[in-house]
C-alpha cells in the first residue's frame, strides 16, 4: 500500500511527511529542532517572515527531485518564493537534512538576499557553525596551513569561481568569513551589504565597511591564525576533511 502524505502546522512551519516513515516517527523532534533554529535565525537577522516555511520531508534524494521538480538529485533544496518559501529535504535513518541551512536560505531571501552565491552559502554556514562536525574556523585553519585555502575575495567576486571549488573547502571558509563579519561589524552592516549590492562588490564593501574587501580578508586570516588549536585537534580535523 502506497504511503499517504500527511500535513501538520506549527507556529512557523507547515510540515508534509508520509505515513510509516522515519519522518513521521521522529516528527516531534523535527518540529522542536526547526522551531529552535527559526528563533535563532530570526533573532540574529532581526526579521520575521510573513509566511510560514513549508517543509516536504522525503525518503530519498530521488524523491526530493521528483516532488520538487529540481534538476538533479539532492539531499535538500529551497525554493525562494516569498509567498510560499518551500524546502524539500531527505529525512531517513541515515540522512536527516534538517537544521539551520535551508531555513536560513528561505528566511534570509526576504531581508538579507545576496547576489553572491558565496555570501548566500556563507550565511547558512554561519548558522551551521561546522562542516562534518568540524568548526568552520578550524577547517579554515587547516586549509591555510596546508595551502588549500581559497580566498573569500575571489569567491565573492565570481560565482563561477565559487562553484569550481570543492564544497568541503568553500562552504566552511565562507561560513567562518561570515562569522568574522557579523561578530566584528554587526548584522546591520551585513544586511546593508546585501541590500546595497550593485554588481560591484569591492565598491560595496568599501562603502559599507569603510575598508576594502582585501583588507577585511587580511583581518580574517589574521584572526584565524591567532586562534589556538592543539596538534591533536588539527590532526583530527585533517583526517576527517581529507578522508572523503
Regions found by a protein language model. Give the residues of each.
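Acidic/His/Gly-enriched intrinsically disordered linker/tail segments
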Residues: 69-83, 90-94, 110-244
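Juxtacatalytic substrate-recognition/specificity segment
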Residues: 2-116, 201
Amino acid at each position: 500500500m502506497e504511503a499517504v502524505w500527511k500535513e501538520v502546522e506549527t507556529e512557523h512551519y507547515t510540515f508534509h511527511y508520509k505515513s510509516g516513515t522515519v519522518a513521521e516517527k521522529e516528527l516531534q523532534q523535527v518540529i522542536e529542532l526547526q522551531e529552535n533554529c527559526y528563533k535563532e535565525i530570526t533573532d540574529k537577522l532581526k526579521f520575521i517572515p510573513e509566511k510560514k516555511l513549508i517543509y516536504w520531508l522525503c525518503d530519498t534524494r530521488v524523491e526530493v527531485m521528483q516532488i520538487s521538480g529540481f534538476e538533479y538529485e539532492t539531499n535538500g533544496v529551497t525554493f525562494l518564493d516569498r509567498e510560499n518559501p518551500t524546502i524539500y529535504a531527505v529525512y531517513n535513518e541515515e540522512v536527516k537534512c534538517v537544521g539551520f541551512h535551508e531555513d536560513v536560505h528561505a528566511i534570509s531571501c526576504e531581508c538579507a538576499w545576496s547576489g553572491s552565491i558565496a555570501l548566500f552559502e556563507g550565511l547558512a554556514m554561519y548558522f551551521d557553525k561546522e562542516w562534518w562536525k568540524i568548526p568552520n574556523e578550524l577547517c579554515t585553519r587547516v586549509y591555510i596551513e596546508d595551502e588549500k585555502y581559497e580566498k573569500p575575495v575571489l569567491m565573492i567576486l565570481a560565482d563561477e569561481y565559487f562553484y569550481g571549488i570543492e564544497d568541503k573547502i568553500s562552504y566552511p571558509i565562507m561560513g567562518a568569513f561570515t562569522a568574522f563579519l557579523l561578530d566584528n561589524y554587526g548584522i546591520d552592516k551585513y544586511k546593508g551589504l546585501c541590500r546595497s549590492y550593485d554588481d560591484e562588490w569591492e565598491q560595496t564593501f568599501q562603502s559599507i565597511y569603510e575598508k576594502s574587501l582585501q583588507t577585511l580578508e587580511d583581518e580574517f586570516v589574521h584572526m584565524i591564525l591567532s586562534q589556538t588549536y592543539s596538534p591533536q585537534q588539527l590532526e583530527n580535523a585533517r583526517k576527517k576533511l581529507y578522508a572523503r
